[in-house]
Amino acid sequence: MMKYYDLAKFTIYQIAEMDKGLSELSPMQQALIYSFCENHDKAIEVLDGISWNRAEMTMCALLAKVQMKAKRTKEAVEVLKKALDAISHSDKGPDATAISADCLYNLGLCYMEEGNLQMTYKLAITDLTTAISMDKNSYTAFYNRALCYTKIRELQMALTDYGIVLLLDATETVKLNTFLNRGLIYVELGQYGFALEDFKQAALISRTNGSLCHATAMCHHRINEFEEAVNFFTWALKINPCFLDAYVGRGNSYMEYGHDEATKQAQKDFLKALHINPAYIKARISFGYNLQAQGKFQKAWNHFTIAIDTDPKNYLAYEGRAVVCLQMGNNFAAMQDINAAMKISTTAEFLTNRGVIHEFMGHKQNAMKDYQDAITLNPKYSLAYFNAGNIYFHHRQFSQASDYFSKALKFDPENEYVLMNRAITNTILKKYEEAKEDFANVIESCPFWAAVYFNRAHFYYCLKQYELAEEDLNKALSLKPNDALVYNFRAKVRGKIGLIEEAMADYNQALDLEDYASVI
């Protein structure tokens, strides 16, 4: 096939060099040959010499396309507008409609080529909308309009157009790009479930695209579907065994499993990435957190330090080392590292982390200032509200604490720690119905968490429902058998019920456990 193409190409070049051969051709044929041979100036000269009439607008469209190839975008815009004006005054018919749609499409491309950003894209949208009104099955017009909407940040309009493209008889390449582009918009909007479906469809079209598998895996990770994330990261690695981001992504997904075997499997992935590229910072930082999770704080500190030495501007490495320093009891070093991170990038997360360090150092006033600054910087950052609420609780400002816990839940509705703290606070404030609902929600999501049963027992105790309190304390002890606090409180509850012997036995058990703990 290529031999025939090369022969045809050679023949066209030969004709272009023969005046006699060209003179026997029509002006349109001559222009096409000159344009094919990339002699755009000559092609434009031929077409400029033609006196057009309304029935020959194809000439006008051809001239504009040649000018576009010659990078004469402004001239192309003028010609296209001239053609559209002529068509608007001619008898309408299928040919005129097709030429008009083609002119409008190319006019949109010209606007995009000119690069006048907002105005360019808005003008392109106007012209593409006109093209769509003339041919509602033009998937290319819808697709290009979606691209323009994306450029001017009209993301919902872009999503609508991409949806229409997929309903039309688009080519496979356009469908692939549509799924990709729409998926990226969903990621930007934080709608990872929708993005996931688009990336999956794209992966079905392009099965050997490792980046698509990686994007799909990342969406699974974002919506806490960690096993599915591992599967897609593995697929990406089968396509490309040296895909570093896939090793790190799979390792981070394994870390979310929450058991030792998965943590060790994650370590293998991080080490594999570092074996391929020892200077790969993402893998180094993730490996540091992996070692921290295993309680190997000094080794974790070493790897965060290597990351900092490799890239002194990497604020995530400073943050990781600050966390490890805090766990090792070196509060001053932790403060130095988090301040170093904030000099590079001040985020709500870093401010909140610094607030935690202030709390460890006993500086609650400074901690509260950092939490408030974090909220100012990012009013949707749940953890800052939660930590500030805990300080209010500590100072017995329970109404403020409850308000801050509610704000934290607004932005992180499934956080069981915030729910339980609000339940405890509402119990103190005697908002019993709200407290009851919060405790029920926590137990539904965390049925094997001993602490929630212990705290709900306090709630029942306040309501003088001692039998229900005893049931919850029994459940707490079944989950955490040697807790002196629970035995001590159950003794108090049983005393209220009148179970004196059982209460005395619980008091004695609590004392024995406390004595044992003091000896250890």
Curated annotation (Swiss-Prot):
Gene3D superfamilies: Tetratricopeptide repeat domain (1.25.40.10). SMART domains: TPR. TPR repeats lie at residues 57-90, 101-138, 139-172, 176-209, 210-243, 245-280, 281-314, 320-347, 348-381, 382-415, 416-449, 450-483, 484-517. The keyword RNA-binding does not apply. SUPFAM superfamilies: TPR-like (SSF48452). Coiled coil: none annotated. Pfam families: TPR_1, TPR_16, TPR_8. Keywords: Repeat, TPR repeat. This is Tetratricopeptide repeat protein 6. It comes from Homo sapiens (Human). The gene is TTC6.
